[in-house]
């Protein structure tokens, strides 16, 4: 953080606060006094040497408290008339016409200029306000003059052309690819051809295009990939824009309080997209999206601390400096990272209010500021409405920023957690700006929540991490903007706070006693005890190399559980060139979600398992043992981190796994690395498949070779291969039985060479599945005997032959 820049922010905010205070605009004054105080808090954290900084902070916060009653009693400024709003819309039409004019899009520019003229003339006839009439007529003249100037070159040549030769302008087509080689990297994105895919220059396959097309439809609405052409989206209209998808469904709590839908100009006479990006001004209401609001808060805090656009860059329209702007026509476009790629979400600006005119959605404490409510609305639209089932910050932050999600469970039997190592990592990475962090509580009783000032299963934004003489602290914000921690180091704790610690943390217990904004300090030990999960979102810029594959796993492929066989699981080869000093490779598995019920009742437990098998296909889950075993969780995102320490080439097999496969899933596997790598699906070398359906029944359930008297009664099949080549044989039987098979040579054609054999087996008998893969089997005739380990184990089985050469099979017994 830049202390000098924060000091300048504080001076600017204080000046605006005092100005509004003197003008009697108390709501604005309250907002800017808070922002000035927060800027000074951050400046002190960054090493500011300003004298009496704490006194100034307290002065601003005391003025906030004093103004609260004045805000309640003061009547609001009059709202703009319809005709004033029409003038603003006309100005936007002309502005967007001028943009198209500059780009040489003559026909689009003429259309926009003409609509501006029509709107200005219509409104000038309707209003009796002479000043407004003059402004409208002046704007109409300017627009008309430019439209006529543009029309002249078009109309002159057309006079010589026969009408039959005139063809209508074709509608624009979406032939461009989503922005950028890596849409998550900062900076301008290069244009990419329609076929391109990723940072490694690969093209999308037909399967990938179909995956992205299929998962574009979310809750019945299509959200297409965000493309270069979308930067030319039209935002100016003569009438207020209405989303053709209709109003968002409300939650039951909203319905109970709902009065009507309003636009920003119905609430304030000076709507603005962003006054200042602040985590402290964001307030959640009755929508159950605490994790989303916490995600907005930490994104805003990041922007303020590091002066890098993160959250405010995703909403359009934007000016030429890339800053989001208020649109009097009411149309907005938000770029969200959904189902594998950045996608385009169109909304209008209608928001729900209660009978008192209070918003029933999240909002900024500065009521004229819109970005919080509009970004929330876009996300709620995708999620099916304000009746949001709830989420977690990994999902929300990935959608908002594209940053890499990671989950740390502090009380999990399957995941180890080190308090000391975790704190050191979080402290270092947080202050470098590498990571965004939230913390969530788990299930607790109402009495426990009341005792400790915590909300059960609730997400809190992490705003700061500090350490002082061996004591470790986390600063949290409750998205509700009220209700704080009541344990150690709360504002009411008279035992543990020392003057020295208060100075270091810039904390005066008297200040929060005056105003509850939901922000508090908690010790790291208490957070680890009373909270359940820490959600991290990593800056993808840390790992410059990235590529992805989009794919589908059909529910019909393989068994429901992959506890015994991975033969039908999607598998990938990852080859990494590790430099001196080591490297990190992260693999993010993201399941695409297209249905609200799926999101609310996520029953798909996914994971990624890593094997060191030189990129070869893995058939048995535990043979060889996994290099990194995955934990199956019902979150759409799963991150695997591979740490490399020795230089050279490292080759891995990555296996997508589910706990119980019930449904077909679409997913994206994205690899991030600081060093070069290649990543691809493991292809099947086989082009010919043949399946035999058989069963062990009665006498034919003879068991393995240990049972000589009955083993000879097992089914026997014969297969004939005309040419030498590779062969894969798989046997699937009931999971409760251990199964295996033998292959016996009957005859071969010519000299079998080194690949000849008399007898081969599938190895140890295994539950439900076994296989034998031969690099080359000589041309000839062979018998195969499938069996269970014990006699009298009856049931069906499947024998699958996979080769590049046609196979003839017959049953001998």
Curated annotation (Swiss-Prot):
CDD domains found in the cross-reference section: CysPc, MIT_calpain7_1
Annotated InterPro entries: Calpain_cysteine_protease, Calpain_domain_III, Calpain_III, Calpain_III_sf, MIT_dom, MIT_dom_sf, PalB/RIM13_Calpain-like, Papain-like_cys_pep_sf
GO molecular function: calcium-dependent cysteine-type endopeptidase activity; cysteine-type endopeptidase activity
Coiled coil: none
Cell membrane as UniProt keyword: no
Source taxon at top rank: Eukaryota
Residues covered by the Calpain catalytic domain: 232-540
Domain N: annotated span: 702-813
GO BP, sorted A to Z: proteolysis
Pfam family, one: Peptidase_C2
Annotated EC: 3.4.22.-
Keywords noted in UniProt: Acetylation, Hydrolase, Nucleus, Phosphoprotein, Protease, Repeat, Thiol protease
Stretch list, region Domain III: 541-701
Modification N-acetylmethionine occurs at: 1
Function: Calcium-regulated non-lysosomal thiol-protease.
Protein name: Calpain-7
Organism in which the protein naturally occurs: Sus scrofa (Pig)
